[in-house]
Amino acid sequence: AAIAEDYPYDAVDTCAADGMCATACPVRINTGDLMKRLRAERHGERAQAAGEAVAEHWGGVSGTARVALRAAATLPRLAAAASAVARRVLPEDLVPLYSREVPAGGDTRPAAVYPANPAVVFFPTCLHQVFAPAETQQTGEHADRGARPSDTAGRGSGYAFLALCEAAGIAVAVPEGIGGMCCGTPWESKGFTDGARSMARRVVDGLWNSTRQGRLPVVVDASSCTHGLAGLGHLLPDDERVPRLRIEDAVAFTAREILPALTVPAKAASLTLHPTCSTTHLGIGEELRTVAEAVADEVVVPTGWGCCGYAGDRGMLHPELTDGATREEAADVAAYPTETYASCNRTCEMGMSRATGQVYRHVLELLAERCAPQDAGAHRTR
């Protein structure tokens, strides 16, 4: 009886559902998939319909979240008190806990663009629209100022990636309707399968057109979103277009296609690197380290590295999850300070910043701030 009573919290509510258990299991059993299924079974028809409605109006919803976080950042004590009261009245699994380390709302996503001969289609994620990058979080400045893509300071990893492509002479397209697109992970992880499927259809329609029926690769600037987009097939098993879409993380693309065209005149002395669960699933740990080594002379991955437990917004719903998940890694970080700290996913950066007291930033932001093209003219035809 005690196990049954505690199971909803101990298992369903506080599972990060990141699938890292499968990497340790000799037969690849992923209990995160089970937890997502159990979450879905909790939702009735009305809840599923609400989740689908959010997906269908995602552009407005994500924009509202961005504005709300900006407002909260101006009155953090009031926002924290309001969220604490709401969590006493409503289930904690519905109301995130607001605290000072939660970033303000971020920048708008890069606008749709389609040059004459694009080499790649860029999928800028909504993570960096909803949550400001760490630099903006520190300065309190916001970047809706019509800046060129190369003006990356405070604009997040999406604009950093565009700047790196510009420096390397790589033409980039951004899909029409990107403001209403998402990888679908927020719905899947919470068990809103109807919303996840609705979003998957919209994304596949948009990417199919912008990639010229799968001929161009799709590059994504947040590792969890890359992983989510790469796994859309199970939501649309009968859609023959899905396997033809080539999804790649921006870190891997940068390591292979951009770094050879750049020099980094001023490296950091040392960098602590937090790989993510998604980089493990995607198999791009070496590429992440390669980019980090372009930023700093010494790259340190803590021996106690593991899932940060932030898991999208789950670290805000259940802060104790992140506290427990990061304890060993945070101790390693404290024992060996470095000049800078990096990862490749905004919410993981938030989780590690909270756990360690250090400012974690996307490794592409750090690279874009330090790099210069080797010979920009020599690469303009790519």
Enumerate the language-model features and the residues they cover.
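Ferredoxin-type iron-sulfur electron-transfer modules and their immediate structural context
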Residues: 1-15, 26, 32-47
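Iron-sulfur cluster-binding electron-transfer modules in prokaryotic oxidoreductases
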Residues: 32-382
